Amino acid sequence: MAKAKFERLKPHVNVGTIGHVDHGKTTLTAAIATVAAITSGGEAKDYASIDSAPEEKARGITINTSHVEYDTPSRHYAHVDCPGHADYVKNMITGAAQMDGAILVVSATDGPMPQTREHILLSRQVGVPYIVVFMNKCDVVDDEELLELVEMEVRELLSDYDFPGDDTPIIHGSATEALKGSQEKYGQPAVVELLNVLDTYIPEPERDIDKAFLMPIEDVFSISGRGTVVTGRVESGIVRVGEEIEIVGIRDTQKTTCTGVEMFRKLLDEGRAGENCGVLLRGTKREDVQRGQVLAKPGSITPHTKFDAEVYVLSKEEGGRHTPFLNGYRPQFYFRTTDVTGAIQLQDGTEMVMPGDNVEMGVELIHPIAMDKGLRFAIREGGRTVGAGVVANVHV
């Protein structure tokens, strides 16, 4: 049992395969798990077990996703692979599988294809911070110049979307050969090289506890003789008794001081990321605070009404709308704990949005909400979810 405990001490990093259909994402996922099992222990996975991705729900949307775990000597990886293009779109927009870095799989025989571009754009929009490239099927390309040409195209495409194309690691290999156990350069050695690149190129992600304090307010109580208590789950950081905090969103930002933290009816010195707690606020009246606001470290987050978003619109089969919507559509946007009405501005050239589409749009809310790039939300109509989105940019 001691071994399992030791594994947990390794830093944990979330990655995933992205890229065009049939370029070899699932085969590469199986090859990585197999090679990592040989080099660092763990469970080898075959193609079939990864390909039969189970359904899961995120923000009311059904997504097919496979989760594979593997180790390198220095890290533990959780890797997500999706069977279909629509699953990738949904996964990235809902944040069901947040990625610290992505492995872009590009077939050397085809070069970049439409979904290659779309997945790079999505990565930029939803805030995937790092991309590494695995050029697959190199074993069937005889012409070295063709490999160089494809590599150049991939680098240009990454640069088009503000990724550092010139400095991105690109590994040439063959997932099929690696899965067969080949020791040729495109076989298992290429996957070993990919694992090294993941370890060195993708930095260790900042843990929630090390980020600035933020707690979405779920409920507000007034306790006689003590003052106002707000409850919620701490999203990030730590709040300590005696610290100054801000109440952000919906109304003008207010400053207050945390005079107590309670969890399970016990008084604590601090509330930490992941914990459900009550925070006692000095001098704040019950009617000055409401669900949908957040408590935050002063200056760490600002309220906005206007933002750009990347949105996935549910299909009719997923319980979404049966009809398209047009410019000026006014649904509710559900951020963290509350709904806020907002108007949608479609991009020039987009007349309407059909159920099942993914689309970039501008939004203007009727109340400001504490937000940053990367914040997820649901779009609702009369309490049912009709879309999911992520903030791509905020406007001051």
From Swiss-Prot:
Residues 81-84 are annotated as: G3. Gene3D superfamilies: P-loop containing nucleotide triphosphate hydrolases, Translation factors. Keywords: Cytoplasm, Elongation factor, GTP-binding, Hydrolase, Magnesium, Metal-binding, Nucleotide-binding, Protein biosynthesis. GTP binds at residues 19-26, 81-85, 136-139. GO terms for molecular function: GTP binding; GTPase activity; guanosine tetraphosphate binding; translation elongation factor activity. It is found in: Cytoplasm. Its EC number is 3.6.5.3. Disulfide bonds: none annotated. Residues 10-206 form the tr-type G domain. It catalyses: GTP + H2O = GDP + phosphate + H(+). Residues 60-64 are annotated as: G2. It comes from the Bacteria. Residues 136-139 are annotated as: G4. One of its GO terms (cellular component) is cytosol. It is an enzyme of class 3 (hydrolase). Pfam families: GTP_EFTU (PF00009), GTP_EFTU_D2 (PF03144), GTP_EFTU_D3 (PF03143). Mg(2+) binds at residue 26. Residues 19-26 are annotated as: G1. Residues 174-176 are annotated as: G5. Monomer. Belongs to the TRAFAC class translation factor GTPase superfamily. Classic translation factor GTPase family. EF-Tu/EF-1A subfamily. GTP hydrolase that promotes the GTP-dependent binding of aminoacyl-tRNA to the A-site of ribosomes during protein biosynthesis. This is Elongation factor Tu. It comes from Psychrobacter arcticus (strain DSM 17307 / VKM B-2377 / 273-4).
